[in-house]
Amino acid sequence: MAAMDTESAPLTLESLPTDPLLLILSFLDYRDLINCCYVSRRLSQLSSHDPLWRRHCKKYWLISEEEKTQKNQCWKSLFIDTYSDVGRYIDHYAAIKKAWDDLKKYLEPRCPRMVLSLKEGAREEDLDAVEAQIGCKLPDDYRCSYRIHNGQKLVVPGLLGSMALSNHYRSEDLLDVDTAAGGFQQRQGLKSCLPLTFCIHTGLSQYIAVEAAEGRNKNEVFYQCPDQMARNPAAIDMFIIGATFTDWFTSYVNSVVSGGFPIIRDQIFRYVHDPECVATTGDITVSVSTSFLPELSSVHPPHYFFTYRIRIEMSKDALPEKACQLDSRYWRITNAKGDVEEVQGPGVVGEFPIISPGRVYEYTSCTTFSTTSGYMEGYYTFHFLYFKDKIFNVAIPRFHMACPTFRVSIARLEMGPDEYEEMEEEEEEEEEEDDDDSADMDESDDDEEERQRRVFDVPIRRRRCSRLF
């Protein structure tokens, strides 16, 4: 009879063994785990089991075993303390923190000055004060990043990458939140836009739209591009760089730490290399990386400026008698309309480099298109040093260039038909002048020309650069 009573006794939470319950709790998210504390005394005790909080500390706050040991706290206590500090950013913190950690780890041995230029994180009250100053709420992922590092000191090189031609130099610093607030825009064309970066040489900035205005999506990151054909200064086109701050920052960091952007003279150069953009002829390999320059480009009139970096290398296993010298270059340039231009000239960047086993020669040049994309291909002509009468061609792989997605200014979209037709005629005349001004020239990246520093509310003056090959 007693055995039958035992078998028929109801199964309660209190009577369940501990291990199965802990296993079930291990699948819960932190919110559900906290809620379990209010269900019963038994679940409250089990939910405080410290190993359950280890996963959440690692998942949301990236807290390592070493950090736990240093702080001499249990996992649950660490989770609660961190949540009290940055809990409003829990949906963004792990991605942003990982990006910062990866970036610093990668740059410390390669660009130590850049890492030293980073500022300590801002306080919540600092960010609240900026919101009060600009009259807009900052995106949570932006605030999260600035809690970790409040930008960098305005020094060269900038954290957000550099670009150099013989007569042009750009290096973008990540602005601290107070400096950014000083450049917050309320003028027509850039209403409710906050600068993220600034180049002291060109005045170039990347902006984030903290509010949806003038055709921009909220939280979008972009380069401004004044409409040079419009009489309205509010007509500003945009090259879109990221859909959100997180998208913008993490994609940039991934390009850096994956080796996608080369480190040259302690600076991050924003050249993109396609692994398939390599051609080998005999013992010589040619590879190409490219970059779009928004500060020298415009949508109206269509003028898209690209720079490319070419690496020419002879295999270290080549025979000494294979040493050779570059005599000339040939280019076949095709735009998105299928229009083809052929260019031939002596040397490259005014030089006639000698290539020998194991030696590498690199140079930078640039080109422009009146279409949003295009490609180049061609060959170099060499002669052997030991057999000067013997010449041969080395293939340059086809490499494609395309500008980022852009959005046309809402001021242009709102124009009347008569004004629009007049502007279209002016654009066609401008395109014809650009074609007439094209020249066959090479540019090296050795001599850098600094430009005068400009303030945020002054539109960038676009320089017309001839096409360089």
Swiss-Prot record:
Domain (F-box) ranges: 10-56
One GO CC term, this protein: cytoplasm
GO biological process terms held by the UniProt record: protein ubiquitination; response to lipopolysaccharide; SCF-dependent proteasomal ubiquitin-dependent protein catabolic process
Designated name of the protein: F-box only protein 3
Pathway(s): Protein modification; protein ubiquitination
A single MF term (Gene Ontology): ubiquitin-like ligase-substrate adaptor activity
Region (Disordered): 419-454
Task performed by this protein: Substrate recognition component of the SCF (SKP1-CUL1-F-box protein)-type E3 ubiquitin ligase complex, SCF(FBXO3), which mediates the ubiquitination and subsequent proteasomal degradation of target proteins. Mediates the ubiquitination of HIPK2 and probably that of EP300, leading to rapid degradation by the proteasome. In the presence of PML, HIPK2 ubiquitination still occurs, but degradation is prevented. PML, HIPK2 and FBXO3 may act synergically to activate p53/TP53-dependent transactivation.
Residues covered by the ApaG domain: 278-408
Database matches in InterPro entries: ApaG_domain, ApaG_sf, F-box-like_dom_sf, F-box_dom, F-box_SCF_Substrate_Recog, Knr4/Smi1-like_dom, Knr4/Smi1-like_sf
Keyword tRNA-binding: no
Assembly: Part of a SCF (SKP1-cullin-F-box) protein ligase complex SCF(FBXO3) consisting of FBXO3, SKP1, CUL1 and RBX1. Interacts with PML, interaction is direct and takes place either alone or within the SCF complex.
Compositional bias annotation for Acidic residues: 419-449
